[in-house]
């Protein structure tokens, strides 16, 4: 089952916000516990930044191919 880009654009921040709120309510050392990769808080902060970085570098590569191709 694959989701389209607009659905993922809305779904990923909502899921990560839910995980962040869950981490804030459950974990005792919430701000300091976000550095461990075993923590749900780490991934809820990582997911929203992953998609824009991927889109940026994908477009950067495409522009590089368009502008600097040799005929």
Curated annotation (Swiss-Prot):
GO cellular component: endoplasmic reticulum membrane
Subunit-level organization: Component of the glycosylphosphatidylinositol-N-acetylglucosaminyltransferase (GPI-GnT) complex composed at least by PIGA, PIGC, PIGH, PIGP, PIGQ, PIGY and DPM2.
Coiled coil: none
Gene transcribed to yield this protein: pigy
Name of the featured protein: Phosphatidylinositol N-acetylglucosaminyltransferase subunit Y
Function in brief: Part of the glycosylphosphatidylinositol-N-acetylglucosaminyltransferase (GPI-GnT) complex that catalyzes the transfer of N-acetylglucosamine from UDP-N-acetylglucosamine to phosphatidylinositol and participates in the first step of GPI biosynthesis. May act by regulating the catalytic subunit PIGA.
Compartments (UniProt record): Endoplasmic reticulum membrane
Membrane topology per record: Multi-pass membrane protein
Keyword tags: Endoplasmic reticulum, GPI-anchor biosynthesis, Membrane, Transmembrane, Transmembrane helix
Single biological process term from Gene Ontology: GPI anchor biosynthetic process
